[in-house]
Amino acid sequence: MISFEKRLIYIHIPKTGGYTLKKILNPYSPDQLNQVTNRYNESGLSMTDDRTKEDIFHPSVRFYKQHYSDVYEHFTKFAIVRNPWDRMISYMMWLNKGKFDNELFMTWLDLNTTGIFNSTEDVNQVSMLTDNTGKCDIDVMIKYSEFNKIMYFFEARGIDSSLITTKTNSVHKNHYTEYCQYGLKEKIEKVCKLDIDFFGFTYDGDCKETALWF
C-alpha cells in the first residue's frame, strides 16, 4: 500500500497483522480496499492499486520498483516481519479455517510452492522484500513480536494509530511452540531456510540485530 501524503510504501507480508495496518493507512492512500473472497473461501482484504488498477493482496518490493520507480527511492519502505515458525503455523491454520492438522500441514510443507502455497513469497518473507537483483530494498522492519512499535512509527508521521489495539485475522491462540511437534518444527525450518538465514531467527524467537529494525 502506498501513501503519497505520508511518503510511505507498506509491504504487506501475509500473516503479519497487515489487515489492521491497511485500515490505518487507508485514509492516507489512493489505493482502494476491497472485501473479497479468495480461493480458500475465506474473507480477505485485498486492494486495488491506484496506478495499475490491479486487484492485489500482497504487492512486493518488485511491484513497487516497477510501477512506482519515480517515487520509490524517495519514500520510506517498511514491513512487519514474523518468526517463521510462528508465521507458518498461523498461515496454515488460517488456510485450514482455524483448525490444526499436523499430517495435513506436513503434506503442505512437503509440496512447498507446488501445492497450496503459490510462490516463495508465501513461504519466505524476505522474497517479498528483495528486488530483481536479490537486494533487500527496505528501509524499516518491525518485528511482529513487537507489533505495538508500529504506533510510534505512525505517530511520528502524523498517522492515527488508534486501531492498533485491534489486530485482526488471528486464528491461533496458543503459542506456536505448542503446535510445532511431530516433525513440524524441522519441516518449517527446512522450508523457511531463506528467512531463518537472512533474519537470523531462532526457534525461540530471537533474531540477529540489524539497523533496519525499528
PLM feature spans:
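Membrane-interface amphipathic segments in extracytoplasmic regions
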Residues: 1-214
